[in-house]
């Protein structure tokens, strides 16, 4: 007897093939049979010809620490995400003082019993900080060797690759040659290199050149993170150049793919607007520099020069002090005016200081034409750049945390026709699974883990928006993780059947 039988479903198997009407049987957490399946089951679900797909795989998340604080991961499960890869943008939880080894961190995640499957990369910024702190100095040969050893250890203990965050300290202090040597440490393990590039604005093309160079010289697969152009003057121009560069690299044998989130706004920490040199010595050193009048004047000048016409596009998404709650959902320009016409850079710096760097932003900087052009490429997959959150998360976090995958399907595939439905599902399931190296997930096929999403296409809607992000998406009927029903009609069942995934 099967544990579960889902009958009469339009099965989209994740390969890109047209849907077929059939049944899926589940036994011991895995798919036991697909097609016209006979036999009894402990639980039978009549899909009513709704669509059944593999669970969605988020190749670019930041759930590392959040999965320990919010193991039920409503923001993931309620949009159909069953597997989540953290450690992106150069930042991972391990190795650190709290978790000296990746094995320590992954063991802690297992103890937390998450509702989703959890995998991770090791962050170059985290590695560099462990060896050099927040030093702007060029790494010595000995320091690079230490970084390589820590990277290799993380891979031995289950990481799937390495990431960089080249706009964030301390990753941004690295030379290209340092990156080549440290990234190469994942090569013997078949790991991949995911990069938040040095510049996604006016120097986007140069940044892609560097990413391609690092991957080629290091001998690894490349994942360009959240590919986009944030320079308005280069909209509908730069990404056509970079996509052509990627296509050419692929023809020449370099295994490079991209991910993106389907929104015209990004999100990050408010302190990303502080010039990177101010972080030398760490966050506390940066906060002290913001309080020094002479240093602050220089920072103000540099920040305003690089933000011409942009302060009005940057909104406070969350902060914690009670006296500043009124700022959430308002732009830096609005806040500056409310404070009596204050300089916008000073306004930003004062918020960072008041919140001790615990403040986030949403930044509107991309155009729809670029989003769709990138999305249409066969080597691009969705990645939320979000994290595991509850429906009671504070502030106004970016809606990508809660709605990326449903928006991809409902708005861009169904409504806009950017990708056929079966292709869109492939890009959300088997494409990231193969990229990461998950041989037993991403397809509806006998022997695969039963991560499944049942949805009603006509009712799919990414309800989470910038004004009210903390909500479930419409149209997701059921979500199974390793064969266990974990979400149903917008509600979490309480199940916590996720697994910690380690590189094998």
Language-model regions, residue ranges each:
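Histidine-rich, glycine-flanked metal-binding segment
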Residues: 1-5, 10-55, 462-465
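Active-site neighborhoods of metal-dependent hydrolases
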Residues: 115, 121-122, 126, 130-141, ...
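Divalent metal-coordination and catalytic microenvironments
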Residues: 9, 24, 29, 49, ...
């Amino acid at each position: 007897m099967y544990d579960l039988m889902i009958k009469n479903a339009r099965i989209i198997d994740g390969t890109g093939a047209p849907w077929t009407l059939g049944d899926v049987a589940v036994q011991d957490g895995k798919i036991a049979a697909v097609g016209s399946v006979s036999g009894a089951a402990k639980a039978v679900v009549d899909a009513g010809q709704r669509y059944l797909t593999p669970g969605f795989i988020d190749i670019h998340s930041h759930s590392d620490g959040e999965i320990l604080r919010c193991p039920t991961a409503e923001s993931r499960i309620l949009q159909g995400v069953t597997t989540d890869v953290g450690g992106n943008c150069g930042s991972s939880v391990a190795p650190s003082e709290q978790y000296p080894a990746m094995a320590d961190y992954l063991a802690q995640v297992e103890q937390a019993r998450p509702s989703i499957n959890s995998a991770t990369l090791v962050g170059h910024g985290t590695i560099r900080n462990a060896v050099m702190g927040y030093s702007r100095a060029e790494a010595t040969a000995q320091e690079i060797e230490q970084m390589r050893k820590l990277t290799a250890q993380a891979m031995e203990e289950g990481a799937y690759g390495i990431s960089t965050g080249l706009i964030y300290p301390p990753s941004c202090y690295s030379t290209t040659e340092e990156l080549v040597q440290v990234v190469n440490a994942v090569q013997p393990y078949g790991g991949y290199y995911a990069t938040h590039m040095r510049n996604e604005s006016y120097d986007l093309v140069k940044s892609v050149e560097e990413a391609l160079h690092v991957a080629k010289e290091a001998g690894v697969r490349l994942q360009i993170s959240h590919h986009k152009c944030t320079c308005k003057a280069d909209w509908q121009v730069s990404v056509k150049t970079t996509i052509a560069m990627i296509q050419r690299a692929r023809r020449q044998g370099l295994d490079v793919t991209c991910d993106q989130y389907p929104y015209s706004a990004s999100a990050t920490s408010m302190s990303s607007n502080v010039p990177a040199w101010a972080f030398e010595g760490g966050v506390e050193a940066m906060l002290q520099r913001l309080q020094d009048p002479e240093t602050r004047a220089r920072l103000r000048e540099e920040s305003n020069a690089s933000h011409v016409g942009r302060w009005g596009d940057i909104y406070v998404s969350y902060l914690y002090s009670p006296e500043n709650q009124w700022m959430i959902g308002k732009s830096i320009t609005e806040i500056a005016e409310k404070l009596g016409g204050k300089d916008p850079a000073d306004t930003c710096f004062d918020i960072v200081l008041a919140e001790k760097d615990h403040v986030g932003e949403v930044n509107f900087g991309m155009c729809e034409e670029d989003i769709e052009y990138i999305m249409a490429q066969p080597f691009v997959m969705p990645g939320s750049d979000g994290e595991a959150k509850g429906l009671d998360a504070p502030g106004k976090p970016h809606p990508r945390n809660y709605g990326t995958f449903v928006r991809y399907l409902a708005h861009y595939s169904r409504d806009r026709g950017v990708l056929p439905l079966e292709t869109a599902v492939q890009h959300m399931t088997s494409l990231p699974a193969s990229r990461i190296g998950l041989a037993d997930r991403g397809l509806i096929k006998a022997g695969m883990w039963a991560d499944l999403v049942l949805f009603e296409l006509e009712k799919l809607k990414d309800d989470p928006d910038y004004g009210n992000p903390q909500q479930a998406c419409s149209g997701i009927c059921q979500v199974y993780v390793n064969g266990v029903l974990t979400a149903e009609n917008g509600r979490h069942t309480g199940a916590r059947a996720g697994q910690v995934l380690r590189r094998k």
